[in-house]
């Protein structure tokens, strides 16, 4: 019985974000296509070599993508929307970039494809578009070229291919509606062709990713798997690969498939190894996803060994990362500023490869000494004073139902707020951030690098805040913001000011295309050593008689956009953050700030993959928000902001937040999103976004008025606010001024009737 190890994929961007820099240089016209392609080749060769040197037996090939792997699969199948096609019908790398970002160095610009979250991760994929009667053919041979590349370098190659059913599941029908599952028989011949080409190259195993098999799929989709895989069998061995959840609910469907192996995520799923071994066909290989591919923690390898050792010798076994290492930073060894103790608790992608090598060797030999040595720091961490703060744990344990209740119901609060603020009908505001100019970024960077002292930095930030207030007063906005000049990122800023978080220098992970993020890491109990936002909010308020909003990022969003601890529940982390920010609300209130916004853009995206698990998550997610906000007095107005395209299925929870005002992203849906609020009879105030901040286009007064009138047909006008869709951080001042002037004018026109 063989024991091997492998990874499901490796980060693409490069340690120094070389791919990002090459992409952006090419898009800007500063480098050639050949130079871009050369960077890709160099990164792939380096990453294969690094995995091999770290002890990986089977190397993933096909995990590299120029923008996104789902988009790569779409091109492989010839699925190019008409608006992005080349006149001669050819497909090239610019076709791919036009789908991903709407434009490329060649070809006509056209609207980019929709982008959405890859399952429950912070990675985004480009949504495939389907139209009735479309044809599929093998069009983009990137996978085959990269397999040839890796074979020429002498590597042991395992191609990675997104499976046909999951690819269809991830897409959307455009135009005339039809069942996208009906396209399955049209795409299978392309998959057969690709597998035949791989067989010609002497490939033994192909990793075929079907993560949709962890979802609660409709029966018709589950039934589609058997005929699909019947059509694909017999050319090469197929490792059916799942991740992000367990497979037990769909195991009957899986075990009927003509594949030769199954990969299971044993980190995020609840599947028992003994049960899997019992139910899988005896000649199947089991790939055990034991090492967490989407976090940064060193594994306790003694625990992982115990989890899997009983099936050693009973079937072919591969040990693996739970999912692709795409979701982890690349290399811990280049982090020079982390405290030695804290650093010993982490493992990034390359260190996770080393963990897989240690685990394979121990399972082969039975000698676990190296596992014990590797696991010692993570075991010692359990007793570290950096992890446990008795005061935080005591405060969390003492929470009562009263702590998540405002003193009075919305109707009573609204009366007190009207008396305090005396706002006009159709009150105007913005979501929080103003353009982050080069001057602002340079100021922050100089301060961070030590090239600017604290006094000069503070003077500079104060000047930018003052400018933001002057601009808003000139425009005639009713509720102002300070503009967030001091903040680099809405999560990082709070993480830097809370105990229990650490930051990396190079811990970049890909979000989409060329965009990378560097998430904070929650290492211990979270608390607030000092006020975070009060000073600048108070300063901004001193410059105007109009109310200035205090701006906080909510507890669930901070949790979802960070690497969480693994030793406590996500609920515990969210509530600890909520308690820390509750103190911030109290301090803002004491400083005279009467309107406080708590942003929760990630509340919906944190939903578990299975709907049957939603209620428990939403219950604690809502409770965390309410703990954060409930300390506010009746005449303090609590706002929240959310940017989703779907509210229907969580409307109860949105209402349960009990925010006085919710601002939402609605302009791109032409106010259709408000239907959910109307049907639910949402009781509080709403600010439906009246223009799309992601576009530099300036909306006309008439267009904004028309949207607001449409909104007033669904929600009583006295409960409507007027605001953009989202923060204005990425926009320039000229279009920001023009758009806000038109927005204010539209509100004034409506007041006049």
Swiss-Prot record:
Keywords, alphabetical: Amino-acid biosynthesis, Metal-binding, Methionine biosynthesis, Methyltransferase, Repeat, Transferase, Zinc
Record note on cofactor: Binds 1 zinc ion per subunit.
Biological-process GO terms, alphabetical: methionine biosynthetic process; methylation
EC number(s) per entry: 2.1.1.14
Binding site for 5-methyltetrahydropteroyltri-L-glutamate: 17-20, 117, 515-516, 561, 605
UniProt binding sites for Zn(2+): 641, 643, 665, 726
Enzyme class of the recorded protein, top EC level: transferase
Record-listed L-homocysteine binding positions: 431-433, 484, 599
PANTHER family reported for this sequence: 5-METHYLTETRAHYDROPTEROYLTRIGLUTAMATE--HOMOCYSTEINE METHYLTRANSFERASE (PTHR30519)
Protein name: 5-methyltetrahydropteroyltriglutamate--homocysteine methyltransferase
């Amino acid at each position: 019985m063989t024991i091997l190890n492998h990874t499901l994929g490796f980060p693409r961007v490069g340690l120094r974000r070389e791919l990002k820099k090459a992409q952006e240089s090419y898009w800007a016209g500063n480098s050639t296509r050949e130079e871009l392609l050369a960077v890709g080749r160099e990164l792939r060769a380096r990453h294969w070599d690094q995995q091999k040197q770290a002890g990986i037996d089977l190397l993933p090939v096909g995990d590299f993508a120029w923008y996104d792997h789902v988009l790569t699969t779409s091109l492989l199948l010839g699925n190019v929307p008409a608006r992005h096609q080349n006149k001669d019908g050819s497909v090239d790398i610019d076709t791919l970039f036009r789908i991903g970002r709407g434009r490329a160095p060649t070809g006509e610009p056209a609207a980019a494809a929709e982008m959405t979250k890859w399952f429950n991760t912070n990675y985004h994929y480009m949504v495939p578009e389907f139209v009735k009667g479309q044809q599929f053919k093998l069009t983009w041979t990137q996978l085959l070229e990269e397999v040839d590349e890796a074979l020429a370098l002498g590597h042991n190659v395992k191609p990675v291919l997104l499976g046909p059913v999951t690819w269809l599941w991830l897409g959307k029908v455009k135009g005339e509606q039809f069942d996208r599952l009906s396209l399955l028989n049209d795409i299978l011949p392309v998959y057969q062709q690709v597998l035949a080409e791989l067989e010609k190259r002497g490939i033994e195993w192909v990793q075929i990713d079907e993560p949709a098999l962890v979802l609660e799929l409709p029966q018709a989709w589950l039934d589609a798997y058997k005929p699909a895989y019947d059509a694909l069998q017999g050319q090469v061995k197929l490792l059916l690969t799942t991740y992000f959840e367990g497979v037990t609910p769909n195991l009957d469907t899986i075990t009927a498939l003509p594949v030769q192996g199954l990969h299971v995520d044993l980190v995020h799923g609840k599947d028992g190894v003994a049960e899997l071994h019992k139910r899988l066909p005896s000649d199947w290989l089991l790939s055990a996803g034991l090492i967490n591919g989407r976090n940064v923690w060193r594994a306790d390898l003694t625990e992982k060994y115990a989890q899997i050792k009983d099936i050693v010798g009973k079937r072919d076994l591969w040990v693996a990362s739970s999912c692709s290492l795409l979701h982890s930073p690349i290399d811990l060894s280049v982090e020079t500023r982390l405290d030695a103790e804290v650093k010993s608790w982490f493992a990034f992608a390359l260190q996770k490869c080393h963990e897989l090598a240690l685990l394979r060797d121990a399972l082969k030999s039975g000698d676990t000494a190296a596992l014990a040595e590797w696991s010692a720091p993570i075991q010692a961490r359990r007793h570290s004073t950096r992890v446990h703060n008795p005061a935080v744990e005591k405060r969390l344990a003492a929470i009562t139902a009263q702590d998540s209740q405002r003193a009075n119901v919305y109707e009573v609060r609204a009366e007190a707020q009207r008396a305090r603020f005396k706002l006009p009908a159709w009150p105007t505001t913005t979501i929080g951030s103003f353009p982050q100019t080069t001057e602002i970024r340079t100021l922050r960077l100089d301060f961070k690098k030590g090239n600017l002292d604290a006094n000069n930095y503070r003077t500079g930030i104060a000047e930018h805040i003052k400018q933001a207030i002057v601009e808003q007063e000139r425009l005639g906005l009713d509720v102002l913001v300070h503009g967030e000049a001091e903040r680099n990122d809405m999560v990082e800023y709070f993480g830097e000011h809370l105990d229990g978080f650490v930051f990396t220098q190079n811990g970049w992970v890909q979000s989409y295309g060329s965009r990378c993020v560097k998430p904070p890491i929650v290492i211990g109990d979270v608390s607030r050593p000092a006020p975070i936002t009060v000073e600048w909010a108070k300063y901004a308020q001193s410059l105007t008689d109009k109310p200035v909003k205090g701006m906080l990022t909510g507890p669930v969003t901070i949790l979802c956009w960070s690497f969480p601890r693994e030793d406590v529940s996500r609920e515990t982390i969210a509530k600890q953050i909520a308690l820390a920010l509750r103190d911030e609300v109290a301090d803002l209130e004491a400083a005279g700030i009467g309107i406080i916004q708590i942003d929760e853009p990630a509340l919906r995206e944190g939903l578990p993959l299975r709907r049957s698990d939603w209620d428990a998550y939403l219950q604690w997610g809502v409770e965390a928000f309410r703990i954060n906000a409930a300390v506010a007095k009746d005449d303090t107005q609590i706002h929240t902001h959310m940017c989703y395209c779907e509210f229907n299925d969580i409307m109860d929870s949105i209402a349960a937040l009990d925010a006085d005002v919710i601002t939402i992203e609605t302009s791109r849906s032409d106010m259709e999103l408000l239907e959910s609020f109307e049907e639910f009879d949402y009781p509080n105030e709403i600010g439906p976004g009246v223009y799309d901040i992601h576009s530099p286009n300036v909306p006309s007064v008439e267009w904004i008025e028309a949207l607001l009138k449409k909104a007033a047909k669904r929600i009583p006008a006295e409960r409507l606010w007027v605001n953009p869709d989202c923060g204005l951080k990425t926009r320039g001042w000229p279009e920001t001024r023009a758009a806000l002037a038109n927005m204010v004018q539209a509100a004034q026109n409506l007041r006049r009737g």
